[in-house]
């Protein structure tokens, strides 16, 4: 497998740049041969809900219809990190308290999440339940590990820019996380690793990695097959999680018309890599019919 980087946020972020980023442009900046597009970026809240502009929708529509020889590109999107604010009041429920368990934003406010072409990913902590920040909503498909902030609770370990002269872990940048502190830790003396990677931007690529394993096991899978396998093999977590506010049931696991369990915090649940790959091996590709 190969990795290709495209810094959409560094671009003009116009429709043409987006089309290039998702493989539906002229191919000069993002090759149409890419299988999985991980989109770890989001919008700034607060914001009103609005639909995806038609030009961006068409770019995704083209991607799922023509890329991967017609099997469709796989688009994976981070849900967002706005369950609470980094300001006062921090929490957005009627009592302004964490015990309200009411998010300050909905993942569906991110316009890309409003399309069926995108796999929206929420973030789990090291205990396998929702992180403190992960944005919920009916647009979530599955959840992957994103970690907390790497100080009192674990985050995700990842590579950093090499050497102590650049990157998140570098000389002159003190950190309360000893592993990340300027190369002073014996196991990170060259500052090549960062143990504070987090956010749904961290969770999304863990799911992209699972999808890569699925396509390695069965390269004939369509984009819809991938979504179906993830939905049917993911694991229910935090099973008793429920909350009623002002007489309205806000959060609980429900069983949909297809007999799949779903929760606005978790989507269809925690991705199970082994089960997803096993299912992919024997899956009859393109067997879901038209839609």
For each of these PLM feature ranges, what is it?
Residues 2, 35, 72-75, 119, ...:
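Proline-centered loop/turn at the N-terminus of a beta-strand
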Residues 5-115, 127-129, 187-206, 217-220, ...:
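Substrate-binding/access-modulating region of protease and related hydrolase catalytic domains
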Residues 54, 58, 140, 204-212, ...:
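A structural signal for well-ordered alpha-helical segments within the folded catalytic domains
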Residues 74-78, 143, 227-231:
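Outer-envelope exported proteins of Gram-negative bacteria
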Residues 87-91, 133-134, 241-244:
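Short aromatic-enriched loop/helix-cap "lid" or pocket-rim segments at secondary-structure transitions
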Residues 101-212, 216:
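Extracellular S/T/G-rich loop segment that most often corresponds to the catalytic His/Ser-adjacent loop
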């Amino acid at each position: 497998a190969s990795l290709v980087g495209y810094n959409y946020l560094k671009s003009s972020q116009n429709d043409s740049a987006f089309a290039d980023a998702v493989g539906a442009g002229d191919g000069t900046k993002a090759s149409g041969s890419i299988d999985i597009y991980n989109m770890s970026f989001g919008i700034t809240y607060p914001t009103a809900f609005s639909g995806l502009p038609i030009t961006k929708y068409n770019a995704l529509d083209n991607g799922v219809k023509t890329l991967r020889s017609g099997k469709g590109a796989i688009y994976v999107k981070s849900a967002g990190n706005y369950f609470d604010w980094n300001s006062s009041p921090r929490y957005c429920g009627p009592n302004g308290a964490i015990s309200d368990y009411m998010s300050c934003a909905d993942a569906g406010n991110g316009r890309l999440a409003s399309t069926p072409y995108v796999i929206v990913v929420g973030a789990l902590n090291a205990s396998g339940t929702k992180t403190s920040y992960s944005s919920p909503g009916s647009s979530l498909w599955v959840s992957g590990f994103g970690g907390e902030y790497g100080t009192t609770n674990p985050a995700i370990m990842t590579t950093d820019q090499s050497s102590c002269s650049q990157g998140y872990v570098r000389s002159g940048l003190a950190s309360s996380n000893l592993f990340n502190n300027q190369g002073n830790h014996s196991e990170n003396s060259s500052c090549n690793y960062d143990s504070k990677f987090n956010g749904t931007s961290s969770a999304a690529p863990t799911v992209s990695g699972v999808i890569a394993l699925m396509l390695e096991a069965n390269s004939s899978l369509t984009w819809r097959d991938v979504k179906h396998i993830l939905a049917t093999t993911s694991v229910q977590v935090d099973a008793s999680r429920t909350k009623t506010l002002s007489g309205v049931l806000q959060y609980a696991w429900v069983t949909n018309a297809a007999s799949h369990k779903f929760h606005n915090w978790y989507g269809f649940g925690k991705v199970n890599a082994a089960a997803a790959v096993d299912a992919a091996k024997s899956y009859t590709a393109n067997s879901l019919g038209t839609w």
